[in-house]
UniProtKB/Swiss-Prot annotation:
CDD domains (UniProt xref): ADP_Glucose_PP (cd02508), LbH_G1P_AT_C (cd04651)
UniProt KW keywords: ATP-binding, Carbohydrate metabolism, Glycogen biosynthesis, Glycogen metabolism, Nucleotide-binding, Nucleotidyltransferase, Transferase
Secretion signal, residue range per the UniProt entry: none
GO cellular component: carboxysome
Protein name according to UniProt: Glucose-1-phosphate adenylyltransferase
Length: 429
């Protein structure tokens, strides 16, 4: 895989994941208590021995850069690296990235310097485990110019994805980006051609692009150079290439979830607790997911009732009840709290006992969840200060609300407490 260069698309402003992207780039959003979204594609690359990795981003990239620098230091791999490329304005390109393809085009001069045969284009906000070496191998065996990784999908979700039709040889003959109505119906196919049984084919009659591509180096360079007005892979480059290039589909059979929205992100995190077997597991020795080694102490649990939950390292929780929740690193939960169906991202630092007591004496709130608080169906971002006897349960069943001045948003009925928020004692949300 030394002849493959990976390019991870960090996405735009991350509006669908806001407010989690208020102070960080989308790939830097915490995941499963101790990871970040970017760890998924980078780990998949490392496991496939693809060690030349660029990450393209244009918003709030400082924390992403810091995480990647501290985590992925390929000392000893003479040409291995993970590097962030932020959008920059030049005389040739005075504007920011206009889309996924434009982002790659603007750094084409840099990618072109590498002696590689293929570019592996990845997304930074998906949860899945894939053997990219198998993906690239299939691309080479079929003699494709471009190979798309695809999944069969049901009608309910089909209009949110790029859909395609393929022939008996797996070649893509038609492609439509997020079709609606009659155009959607025309993209319906017999997915048994992918190896699904009749029942599965009936349930999932569409073939969806995962937004993961392998391009031959020359094919991508030509497409970007000859179509300067085309700025997006899914909307323009791929549909336009179907006629003149050999486009192949690669069926991915594992778990895959686009977690680019608050609701999908919340559901994917809590699904990690599902019994008896979650759809995605971080407990896989053959294909581990890597992240930064933080050297934190073990979690301390004092007289708690914890069920179906994931607790990261370095937490301190006492005399509380936790059910179907994910607790991030350095989470602190005081006595008589109830946390249910929630994602707590934890903290970036510890406060000493003296500091915490001093804050309480001044009527201020330490980092963590204060005594007697109840949190249900919520996401609490890092370093939040939740006071005592606070209730966060979306009491009025509001679907959408922007209350940034009060320290929270509501998205799809999920309360999202923003990073560094302060929620006063006795607050009811």
């Amino acid at each position: 895989m030394k002849k493959v260069l990976a390019i991870i698309l960090g996405g735009g402003a991350g509006t669908r994941l806001y407010p989690l992207t208020k102070l960080r780039a989308k790939p830097a959003v915490p995941l499963a208590g101790k990871y970040r979204l970017i760890d998924i594609p980078v780990s998949n690359c490392i496991n496939a021995e693809i060690l030349k990795i660029y990450v393209l981003t244009q918003f709030n990239s400082a924390s992403l850069n810091r995480h990647l620098t501290r985590t992925y230091n390929f000392t000893g791999f003479h040409d291995g690296f993970v590097e962030v490329l932020a959008a920059q304005q030049t005389t040739e390109n005075p504007s920011w990235f206009q889309g996924t393809a434009d982002a790659v085009r603007q750094y084409g001069w840099l990618f072109d310097e590498w002696d590689v045969d293929e570019y592996l284009i990845l997304s930074g906000d998906h949860l899945y485990r894939m053997d990219y070496s198998d993906f690239v191998k299939r691309h080479r065996e079929t003699g494709a110019d471009i190979t798309l990784s695809v999944v069969p999908i049901d009608e309910k979700r089909a209009s949110s994805f790029g859909l395609m039709k393929i022939d008996d040889n797996g070649r893509i003959v038609d492609f439509s980006e997020k079709p609606k109505g009659e155009e959607l119906k025309q993209m319906q196919v017999d997915t048994s051609i992918l190896g699904l049984n009749p029942e599965q084919a009936k349930e999932s009659p569409y073939i969806a692009s995962m937004g993961i591509y392998v391009f031959n180096k020359k094919a991508l360079n030509d497409l970007l150079k000859n179509n300067p007005e085309q700025t997006d892979f899914g909307k323009e480059i791929i549909p336009g290439a179907a006629k003149d290039y050999n486009l192949q589909a690669y069926l991915f059979k594992g778990y895959w979830e686009d977690i680019g929205t608050i609701e999908a992100f919340y559901e994917a995190n809590l699904a990690l607790n599902r019994q008896p077997r979650p759809s995605f597991s971080f407990y896989n020795e053959k294909a581990p997911i890597y992240t930064r080694a933080r050297n934190l102490p073990p979690t301390k649990v004092l007289n708690c009732n914890i069920t179906e939950s994931m607790i990261s390292e370095g937490c301190m929780i006492k005399d509380c009840r936790i059910h179907n929740s994910v607790l991030g690193i350095r989470s602190r939960i005081e006595t008589d709290c109830v946390v249910e169906d929630s994602l707590l991202m934890g903290a970036d630092y510890y406060e000493s006992l003296e500091t915490r007591q001093s804050l309480l004496d001044q009527g201020k709130i330490p980092v963590g969840i204060g005594k007697g608080s109840t949190i249900r169906r919520a996401i609490v971002d890092k370093n939040a200060r939740i006071g005592q006897n606070v209730t966060i349960v979306n009491k009025e069943n509001i679907e959408e609300s922007n209350r940034e001045d009060d320290g929270f948003y509501i998205r799809n009925g999920i309360v999202v407490v923003i990073k560094n928020a302060v929620i006063p004692d006795g607050t009811v949300i």
